[in-house]
């Protein structure tokens, strides 16, 4: 069996629409498989010496407050050390798991204007990710 794996920064329209359906389903846990850029690259072209991981870390330390503000909790975060089973062309750098009361809580968090301010560090640091919803 071959599985196509494609890291992305943002969900596509079909994924967004699916997430909006049954927004009260929950609790949900989001498993994030993260791949960082070698060097952070900000959309506003600011000069930086940060690695992608360092830029993402600026986002990560702040996003925990937003997860909690919307009734969720940060469950786990860690660096990937190796692949135990299976094969992928390029291994992810880190894994993070966050739990939300429901889809709506996560969506509300992402729409928060204060959250949007820290999102620039996420985008600057991430080469791509897989974000897997579990119920």
What do these predicted regions represent?
Residues 1-94, 101, 105, 135:
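Short S/T/G/P-rich N-terminal loop/turn motif that feeds into the first structured element of a domain
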Residues 97-135:
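Short, Lys/Arg-rich amphipathic alpha-helical interaction segments
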């Amino acid at each position: 069996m071959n599985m196509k794996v494609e890291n992305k920064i943002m969900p596509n329209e079909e994924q967004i629409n699916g997430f909006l359906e049954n927004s009260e389903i929950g609790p949900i846990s989001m498993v994030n498989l993260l791949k960082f850029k070698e060097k952070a690259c900000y959309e506003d072209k600011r000069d930086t010496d940060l690695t992608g991981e360092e830029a993402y870390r600026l986002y990560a330390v702040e996003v925990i407050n937003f997860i909690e503000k919307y009734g969720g909790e940060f469950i786990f975060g860690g660096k990937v050390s190796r692949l135990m089973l299976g094969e992928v062309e390029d291994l992810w750098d880190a894994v993070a798991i966050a739990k939300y009361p429901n889809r709506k809580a996560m969506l509300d968090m992402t729409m928060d204007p204060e959250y949007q301010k820290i999102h620039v560090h996420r985008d600057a640091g991430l080469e791509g990710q897989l974000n897997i919803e579990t119920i």
